[in-house]
């Protein structure tokens, strides 16, 4: 897929994981 999407995913996924696990 597009490198831009990969970049966005790299920023979004950690945030979602942080919020989901309450380990910010």
Curated annotation (Swiss-Prot):
UniProt note on tissues of expression: Expressed by the skin glands.
Ribonucleoprotein among keywords: no
Broad class of where this protein is predominantly found: secreted
Subcellular location: Secreted; Target cell membrane
Keywords, in A-Z order: Amphibian defense peptide, Antibiotic, Antimicrobial, Disulfide bond, Immunity, Innate immunity, Membrane, Secreted, Target cell membrane, Target membrane
Disulfide cross-links: 18-24
GO biological process, alphabetically ordered: defense response to bacterium; innate immune response
A GO cellular-component term linked to this record: membrane
Function: Antibacterial peptide. Has activity against the Gram-positive bacterium S.aureus (MIC=2 uM) and the Gram-negative bacterium E.coli (MIC=32 uM). Has a strong hemolytic activity (LC(50)=5 uM).
Homology family: Belongs to the frog skin active peptide (FSAP) family. Brevinin subfamily.
Name of the molecule in the record: Brevinin-1CSa
Species for this entry: Rana cascadae
């Amino acid at each position: 897929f597009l490198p831009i999407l990969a970049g966005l995913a790299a920023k979004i996924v950690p945030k979602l994981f942080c919020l989901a696990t309450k380990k910010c």
